[in-house]
């Protein structure tokens, strides 16, 4: 029965949805990808959030252009996490982005694919994230690598509250070291409303009319990587 379910076609995509960069190497843990954008959009739109985060380590497989099966979606999100909506401050969002980009240009499962916001990582600034012996966030002890954080086209206000959609692993359990979140530090507005792969299916079927189209052909320029040598969006820098 499960085999039949996995083969069931749930939607279509006109573009290949990928975890890889232009060079064919895995990128979702260190750069924006079109599948990362899609997964983050699904959380933000379905939960009605200002911002959504998806950890790159939770985006596990590509989807080739053509039919999308239930199995394809499960392969993308195989962990069975559940969608949550929480209230956080701009400072918590900024600290999360800083933790997510701490390992860059190296990979991190906690690298954040985002929706509803854009930001720049300045790779020339060394990370000053302090972690405890469990690799959990403690504080930022120096200059931030992340800047130009815009939410819905407006500069992030560290003192303002925003609604943030993601899964229980990050928002409630403070997974991947995201101790600025966790049940002690966030106000839960919607608690484990839907399993992660269903979030993705529902977004494509209900909000995109069952077809992932050209708007997801390439990364949408949400994350810009800045170095002394370049000042281009991540999807462009892959080609240099």
Show which residues each predicted segment covers.
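Catalytic centers of hydrolytic enzymes
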Residues: 1-240
